């Protein structure tokens, strides 16, 4: 006989394993790319697609009925064409980028001066961006990049853009 050594959350106490498999499995082929997941994604140079698996990530789209509800973290896959990236920003929680395919140039930006430090990541390499540290990325390669993004909270705030105008309208895409 199988014995669970940890208790299920109250809302899953009477859920069958068949129901669990339906509720907690998400397949890439079933996910529509969201090219308007972020306010800055409307701007040339920042265009990218988010594929949401667990929670809404930094998009603020936490009510997406097609995703697995985020608990302690979110998980998305980003698709970024060459020459595109995202605007410098912060989060209130840790953010991780884990490259699956292609190459991604990530940066940390010094608050006040705008000075940046860049590192290029390839497949199976990652960066962990601490809360409150200005960061971002660009695909400066010749091929598209796919990478995993995790945020350390089930419903994180919308991205905190370093640019004042973007920050003022950071929820404009919702």
Each model region followed by its residue ranges:
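A short, N-terminal "cap"/entry segment at the start of jelly-roll beta-barrel domains
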Residues: 1-72, 165-174
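Double-stranded beta-helix
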Residues: 2-11, 15, 110-113, 134-174
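Conserved short histidine dyad/triad with adjacent acidic residue
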Residues: 56-63, 74-91, 131
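Short histidine-centered beta-strand/loop micro-motifs
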Residues: 63-69, 86-91, 108, 117-119, ...
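His/acidic/aromatic-lined binding-pocket segments of jelly-roll/cupin-type domains
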Residues: 77-78, 88-90, 94-99, 119, ...
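Glycine- and acidic-residue-biased ligand/ion/polar-headgroup-sensing regions
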Residues: 82, 93-105, 109-111
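Histidine-centered metal-chelating micro-motifs
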Residues: 84-87, 105, 125-127, 131-136
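Short acidic-glycine-tyrosine-enriched beta hairpin
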Residues: 111-131
């Amino acid at each position: 006989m199988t014995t669970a050594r940890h208790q299920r959350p109250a809302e899953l106490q009477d859920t069958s394993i068949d129901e669990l498999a339906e509720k907690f499995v998400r397949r890439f082929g079933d996910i529509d790319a969201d090219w308007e997941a972020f306010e800055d994604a409307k701007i040339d140079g920042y265009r990218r697609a988010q594929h949401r698996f667990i929670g809404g990530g930094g998009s603020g789209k936490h009510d997406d009925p097609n995703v697995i509800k985020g608990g302690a973290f979110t998980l998305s896959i980003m698709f970024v064409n060459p020459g595109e990236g995202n605007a410098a920003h912060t989060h209130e929680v840790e953010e991780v980028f884990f490259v699956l395919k292609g190459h991604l140039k990530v940066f940390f930006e010094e608050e006040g001066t705008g000075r940046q430090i860049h590192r290029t990541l390839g497949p199976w390499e990652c960066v962990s961006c601490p809360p409150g540290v200005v960061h971002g990325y660009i695909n400066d390669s010749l091929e598209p990049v796919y990478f995993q993004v995790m945020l350390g909270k089930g419903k994180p705030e919308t991205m905190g853009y370093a640019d004042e105008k973007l920050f003022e309208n950071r929820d404009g895409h919702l």
